[in-house]
Amino acid sequence: MSRFLEDLRSLSSAEEFFSFLGVEFNPKVVQVNRLHILKKYQTYLKACDAEENGESVSRETHKRCLERAYADFLTSDARSEKLFKVFQSEAGKAFVGLDAILPLAAAERSESKVNSSAEA
């Protein structure tokens, strides 16, 4: 593994990625969208990796991908980008299975029996 990739793997915050790759950024934009920017960066990197036939993606490619991901959030927002599952589901279309409801109903019945016994 190259020194560049080792250093890259040691980064833990979005700000560290921006500094390490030499990408200028507005801290307010990154603070609000950090996870979304990094997720989009990862998406762009995967596309570049496929184009480069699995060869190690260069530092310049990493920088371009991060710049592109950051630029997306200068003109868009997390809800519009829909990178995470919570933003991908349609509003009002949440699914709650019976296996989640039945234990709650049973617990409520047991609790009401205990309460009515205590009152008597």
UniProtKB/Swiss-Prot annotation:
Record keyword NAD present: no
GO biological process per UniProt: nitrogen fixation
Family annotation (InterPro entries): NifW
Keywords from the named record: Nitrogen fixation
Family matches, as HAMAP family: NifW
Similarity comment: Belongs to the NifW family.
Record note on quaternary structure: Homotrimer; associates with NifD.
Protein role: May protect the nitrogenase Fe-Mo protein from oxidative damage.
Protein name: Nitrogenase-stabilizing/protective protein NifW
Organism for this UniProt entry: Rhodospirillum rubrum (strain ATCC 11170 / ATH 1.1.1 / DSM 467 / LMG 4362 / NCIMB 8255 / S1)
Gene name linked to the record: nifW
